[in-house]
């Protein structure tokens, strides 16, 4: 894979069960129907009630330049995030869909569930905690329109970076990124980014395990010929709520790396036997 490469990721559904609830038919000014979305923004949520209003506000502003829809995938948040999302969907200035799942089933499977409800041909994945700037959405979309299959908001290319992280978290991130790149033979600089855009058909095909909280690395590992663009951005640590990252998520990520590595070795062996 080369930088600015493009690709073809394919997916299963490790989707958790969920019931999508769309907002009433959205209309623009003067009562005109809104244009069909060209970009679907999938946002997994769990206890993000405090962040949600600012997220919707930021996406509404971005939707002035780009026809967006927002798909919230809520894992039965005890703080009422899903209920608040339903209420906001009734008057949101952009199309808004809320998918309710019965419990925590992981961020990766939430993204797959959201992609299944998307109406546009391009899906963007971002956090609900305001760490991912909505103003970068046009650049990600333009990269896909320009021929990329995957467009990554990258912390580890020139002009990218991370703000407000303690040294220990920076170290963990770098070690995990290096493990993914070296272990799976990935050439992109930030295969663990949680902020990326991808062609919808890539996420709705079968085959993904949907384990843990990092779906992008599985996309890249399964589709080494993917055409990928990396767009620099600075990750600003979340300003609302608490981090989703847990020891369980880290363990799921390590299991995923091992599973993907074994899968690549098996594919290589099968290829050699056929020669």
Regions found by a protein language model. Name each.
Residues 38-40, 69:
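Cell-envelope/extracellular polymer assembly enzymes that use nucleotide-activated donors
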Residues 50-54, 79-88:
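Acidic helix N-cap motif at the loop->helix transition within catalytic regions
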Residues 74-83, 103, 130:
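A conserved acidic beta->alpha catalytic loop
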